[in-house]
């Protein structure tokens, strides 16, 4: 009987557990559950990720992806996230084309063409730091070659992102960190965090991808071969196509003799060749086009991408928990960080390889190819410094002009203010102070205290205001920093006979006064300019009138080069075009460019944001740090805490007074209770003593005298 009841009890417990079990276990949600349920592969080519449009690489995920509904493509072949939809290509889209790229300026990416042509930012440098582009440019310039590209493309799906998709958790948290700094008026820290956001999530967000596969052959042939066949570019592209089809064992029905001659001539002028397979099965020598195409299924990749800039997705509807005005400020901060990334990687110069002013490092034309060089005189430079707080920093920041021995320019020259910034250095020192208890028991306590020393430096260089005597200025021998080399020496050093002068925090400018021995190492100098100050040497009118705004560019015949990025400000210098252009292409300059403050300044804790447009107020909960739309009563309470009541008492003062009154009342009540209890105890003791004395006296009076008998015996 007992065993039967035990079995029944266990059965009831199992039944209850099954009844309470949810339809979908939250721990098992995701694409793995969908794969196990539907027995289908997951589509891996998805939009919603960050994209670096300079390097053409995928970055961190911006749009969140979930697989709650186990959606599939319309043809039922792949599992897709809830936030995307696909447009299947109902017909076969096998494309084959052949093209000539006679200049790297007209570069088009194989797998990122659409997003590289997006025009909202500096589109001229889109893709210019990708591996594909840098290989093409280097081979074209070094080998004096042109590029032919033959490709077969098979597009299976177009995958698009839903407009109602939410931002990913990591991206949202990064935005909230920036917002927190903006609320506290910590602009510099917010800029630093925005630059980190660009480093991690790129410049754009992919909104659409073409999923499929592509087989591409890129050849580099001598430019002379194209010139010899100038009237028949079709002949060159046909030769490239035949060479490609021979690789994939595709039979071409043309005249065998002419085909052989074309192919031999083409191959004899080929300096470099590469075949790439994007998607499908890996390419190998002897593979047929048919075999490669059959292997595309389950090997899909992105063969084209489209998208929008990162800040386009920072909108109030994507961040409903933040005030609209704060979201706009956040979006602008991120947009500025993206623009800095583009600006610091834009290298203006002559892009015509046939010009003597050609600049191999340039990625944007600046019309300097035909300009004539004007000789300018360099009047030196100097840097002033003012201590603001802490230890002495100016001894490493001050620099006197070599020509004057002072913080000034020579006669006939005028100073040009390049930049003013604040330099910070942290230091710690032992500080001791006396701590006392009840002003009697005292001891000396010592501890290491971290402090920040600050100094402001102001950098100047000297430009001639008119005609100056020959050999009166300084010779310029390049410059370098602790992170870059001097192109004149290919090292962090100056040429022989040159002296390094300090500028900004880490820049060393090489100069010389020796016109006999130092001249062979000098280069024609065309001035400096920065993010706040232009170059007065750009034209004669500006040079005569220093008070007029100067253009931030180099004079004709000079090319622009980066000197340093000083705490988010780019400083450039100009030398004769065609110089400092050798070597390999410059790598991309990644953010952050702004230095985070060593210690945060006194922050303003914003708790109320009022919009004049919508007449609504947002209140920040001090406990959760979350924003919410404020009700009238909550708004009144918040305003009372911030501004105090009508008598001018602040929230902190009111709280202090209240606490003091409570403590005082507590002390009074405690003393009253103690006094009452003490009084009661004393009264009780007094009553007991009186009773005892009465009993004693009564007993004495009742006892008979000695020798007398009781008159009433029993």
Swiss-Prot record:
Q: Which UniProt keywords apply?
A: Adaptive immunity, Cytoplasmic vesicle, Disulfide bond, Glycoprotein, Immunity, Innate immunity, Membrane, Signal, Transmembrane, Transmembrane beta strand, Transmembrane helix, Ubl conjugation
- Region annotated Disordered sits at 690-714
- Disulfide bond entries: 34-70, 350-369, 385-394, 432-446, 436-442, 531-569, 554-574
Where is this chain glycosylated?
185, 269, 375
Q: How is its activity regulated?
A: Forms arc- and ring-shaped pre-pores on top of the membrane at neutral to slightly acidic pH conditions and converts to pores upon acidification. Undergoes transition from the pre-pore to the pore in a processive clockwise hand-over-hand process. In the pore state, 2 alpha-helical regions refold into transmembrane hairpins (TMH1 and TMH2) in each protomer that form in the ensemble complex giant beta-barrel transmembrane pores.
UniProt remark on domains = The MACPF domain includes the central machinery of pore formation: acidification causes a significant structural rearrangement, leading to oligomerization and deployment of the transmembrane beta-strands (named TMH1 and TMH2) that enter the membrane as amphipathic beta-hairpins. The P2 region contains beta-hairpins to interact with target membranes.
* The protein's name: Macrophage-expressed gene 1 protein
């Amino acid at each position: 009987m007992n065993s039967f009841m035990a079995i029944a009890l266990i059965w009831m417990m199992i039944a209850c557990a099954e009844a309470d079990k949810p339809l979908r276990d939250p721990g098992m949600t995701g694409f793995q559950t969908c794969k196990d349920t539907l027995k289908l592969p997951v589509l891996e080519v998805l939009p919603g990720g960050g994209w670096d449009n300079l390097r053409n690489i995928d970055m961190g995920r911006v749009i969140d992806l979930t697989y709650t509904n186990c959606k599939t493509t319309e043809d039922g072949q792949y599992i897709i996230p809830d936030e995307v939809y696909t447009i299947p290509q109902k017909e076969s889209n096998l494309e084959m084309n052949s093209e000539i790229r006679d200049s790297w300026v007209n570069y088009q990416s194989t797998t990122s063409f659409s997003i590289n042509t997006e025009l909202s930012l500096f589109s001229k440098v889109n893709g210019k730091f990708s591996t594909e582009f840098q290989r093409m440019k280097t081979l074209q310039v070094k080998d004096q070659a042109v590029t032919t590209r033959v490709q077969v493309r098979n597009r299976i799906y177009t995958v698009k992102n839903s407009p109602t998709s939410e931002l990913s958790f990591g991206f949202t948290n990064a935005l909230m960190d920036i917002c927190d700094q903006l609320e506290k008026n910590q602009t510099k820290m917010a800029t630093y965090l925005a630059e980190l956001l660009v480093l991690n999530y790129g410049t754009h967000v992919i909104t659409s991808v073409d999923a499929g596969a592509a087989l591409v052959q890129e050849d580099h042939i001598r430019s002379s071969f194209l010139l010899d066949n100038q009237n028949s570019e079709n002949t060159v592209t046909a030769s490239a196509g035949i060479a490609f089809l021979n690789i994939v064992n595709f039979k071409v029905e043309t005249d065998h003799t002419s085909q052989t001659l074309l192919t031999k001539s083409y191959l004899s002028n080929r300096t470099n060749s590469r075949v790439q397979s994007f998607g499908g099965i890996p390419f190998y020598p002897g593979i047929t086009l048919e075999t490669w195409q059959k292997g595309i299924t389950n090997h899909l990749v992105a063969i084209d991408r489209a998208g929008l800039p990162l800040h386009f997705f920072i909108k109030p509807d994507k961040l409903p928990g933040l005030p609209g005005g704060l979201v706009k400020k956040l979006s602008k901060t991120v947009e500025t960080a993206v623009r800095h990334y583009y600006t610091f990687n834009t290298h203006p110069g002559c892009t015509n390889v046939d010009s003597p002013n050609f600049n191999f490092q340039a990625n944007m034309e600046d019309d300097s190819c035909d300009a004539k060089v004007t000789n300018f005189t360099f009047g030196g430079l100097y840097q002033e410094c003012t201590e603001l707080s802490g230890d002495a920093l100016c001894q490493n920041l001050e620099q006197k002009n070599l020509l004057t021995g002072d913080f000034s320019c020579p006669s006939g020259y005028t100073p040009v203010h390049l930049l003013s910034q604040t330099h910070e250095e942290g230091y710690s020192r032992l500080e001791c102070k006396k701590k006392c208890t009840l002003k009697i028991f005292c001891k000396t306590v010592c501890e290491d205290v971290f402090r920040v020393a600050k100094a402001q430096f102001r950098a100047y260089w000297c430009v001639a205001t008119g005609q100056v005597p020959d050999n009166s200025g300084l010779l310029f021998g390049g410059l370098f920093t602790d992170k870059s080399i001097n192109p004149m020496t290919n090292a962090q050093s100056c040429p022989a006979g040159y002296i390094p002068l300090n500028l900004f925090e880490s820049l060393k400018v090489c100069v010389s006064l020796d016109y006999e021995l130092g001249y062979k190492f000098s280069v024609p100098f065309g001035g400096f300019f920065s993010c706040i100050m232009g170059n007065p040497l750009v034209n004669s009118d500006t040079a005569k009138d220093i008070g007029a705004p100067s253009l931030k560019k180099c004079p004709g015949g000079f090319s622009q080069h980066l000197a340093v990025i000083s705490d988010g400000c780019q400083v450039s210098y100009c030398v004769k075009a065609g110089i400092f252009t050798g070597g390999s292409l410059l790598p991309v300059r990644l953010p952050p460019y702004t230095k985070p403050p060593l210690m945060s300044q006194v922050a303003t804790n914003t708790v109320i944001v009022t919009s004049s447009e919508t007449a609504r107020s947002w209140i920040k909960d001090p406990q959760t740090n979350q924003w919410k739309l404020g009700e009238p009563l909550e708004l009144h309470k918040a305003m009372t805490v911030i501004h105090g009541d009508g008598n001018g008492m602040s929230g902190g003062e009111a709280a202090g007074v209240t606490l003091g009154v409570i403590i005082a009342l507590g002390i009074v009540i405690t003393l009253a209770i103690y006094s009452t209890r003490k009084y009661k105890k004393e009264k009780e003791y007094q009553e007991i003593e009186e009773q005892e004395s009465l009993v004693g006296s009564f007993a004495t009076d009742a006892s008979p005298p000695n020798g007398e008998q009781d008159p009433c015996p029993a």
